[in-house]
């Protein structure tokens, strides 16, 4: 009897040794360093190896940990924090997306070391404080889509660059450093507006005129439209 029990135990041990580790224990959960907050601030979700394919459980937010691309697909969010990732965060825009910081919470909508925008969707960011807050200088790149950044201050950082190679970027709020930060493709159209929407002027970059930089303290809104976006708009009118 004892021999039989020992034999059964030996068979059990051998069988278990053949099973993959994942069957015996749950894989360790990896935190990807991105936190997403809902518009009403009732939900705060960390993007991890367990939820990255559908972060909000409604198909609007997904993440690729290999490429560091966070895809927004008709998402309605409160804010995104991504200060812990080692590579620049890329937002891929699909359809219409909004990031609006909760009312009564004096906070930034986007907080990270650097940010890149791609895709052909749209994103409107409205913050109680800064629309985009960067820890180590401003590092903003946009290659497509339509992005509106609106806040008490638009881009917070004393140095760095705002690079536009495609799409359209609208800034609403304080933007006193843009003449030093802007790195736009040749042919980009820049326009400035008063708070009431009246036109302050428009320029095609690069331009010898420095009038637009002198108007930054007066302007309440700036639009930057890359050449490719201008061509697409012209074709749409045909």
Regions inferred by a protein language model and the residue ranges of each:
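Positively charged n-region of N-terminal signal peptides that target proteins for export
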Residues: 1-10
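A composition-driven surface/loop motif
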Residues: 26-238
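C-terminal segment of classical bacterial N-terminal signal peptides
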Residues: 16-23
């Amino acid at each position: 009897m004892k021999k039989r029990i020992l034999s059964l135990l030996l068979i059990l041990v051998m069988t278990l040794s053949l099973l993959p580790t994942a069957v015996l224990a749950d894989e360790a959960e990896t935190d990807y360093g991105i936190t997403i907050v809902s518009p009403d601030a009732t939900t705060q979700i960390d993007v991890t190896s367990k939820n990255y394919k559908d972060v909000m459980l409604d198909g609007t937010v997904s993440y690729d940990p290999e490429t560091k691309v966070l895809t927004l697909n008709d998402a309605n969010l409160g804010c995104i924090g991504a200060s812990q990732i080692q590579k620049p965060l890329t937002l891929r825009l699909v359809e219409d997306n909004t990031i609006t910081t909760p009312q009564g919470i004096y906070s930034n909508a986007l907080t990270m070391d650097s940010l890149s925008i791609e895709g052909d969707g749209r994103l409107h960011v409205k913050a109680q404080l800064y629309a985009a807050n960067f820890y180590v200088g401003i590092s903003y790149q946009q290659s497509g889509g339509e992005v509106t950044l609106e806040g008490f201050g638009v881009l917070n950082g004393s140095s760095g660059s705002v690079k536009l190679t495609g799409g359209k970027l609208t800034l609403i709020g304080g933007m006193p450093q843009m003449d030093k930060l802007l790195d736009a493709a040749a042919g980009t159209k820049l326009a400035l507006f008063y708070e009431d929407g009246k036109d302050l002027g428009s320029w095609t970059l690069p331009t010898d005129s420095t009038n637009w930089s002198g108007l930054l303290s007066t302007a309440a809104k700036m639009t930057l439209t890359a050449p490719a976006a201008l061509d697409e708009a012209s074709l749409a009118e045909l």
